[in-house]
Structure formats: structure tokens, C-alpha cells
Amino acid sequence: MPGYIIATLNNINDPDAFAQYQKSASASFAQYGAKFLLNSRSVETLDGDWQPSGVVVVEFESFELAKNFYDSPEYQAVINQRINSADSAAIVVDGA
């Protein structure tokens, strides 16, 4: 079953640093066979308190592979670029 990392962006505080994160992280995503299903800044809240300004959905072969990617030394080496440049959050979900 596939696994997914879903990330939300609420504000990009430093666009240049965030662009550098995207560039730096791309090799890690590729190494783990990630498939970007959605990368959108067009978000409209229908109900509730969830109001991200952007949503990213990335598919991996399995939940375990998605977790392995996130925990990998390669991704952990660049994750602070995202954390420091954008107000964001990420979760991993099982596609079952």
C-alpha cells in the first residue's frame, strides 16, 4: 500500500531560502521514489479552522518508505531550511 507525506504551508517567510530547500530536497525525494501528486498554492477552506495557503501531497511506495525518507540523513540535513523559511507542518499517512 502506498504511503503519503502531506505538508501544509501557512506562510513562506523567506522565499529565497524556501526555494533553496526545494532544490536541496529534490535529490532526496528522487532517491526514495517520491511522486508529487499535488503542489498547490490555490487553497480554499470549506469548513473548520484549517487554513493553509499551500498543500503538498507526495506518494511513496509504502508508509514505511515515506517514514524512511523523512527520517533519512539526506532529508534531515535539509529539513531545517523548510522549517526556518516557512510556517509549515507535515504528516505521514497510510494509503490503506
Predicted ranges, named:
Residues 54-56, 88-89:
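Generic beta-strand structural signal
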Residues 63-91:
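C-terminal structural segments of small proteins and small subunits
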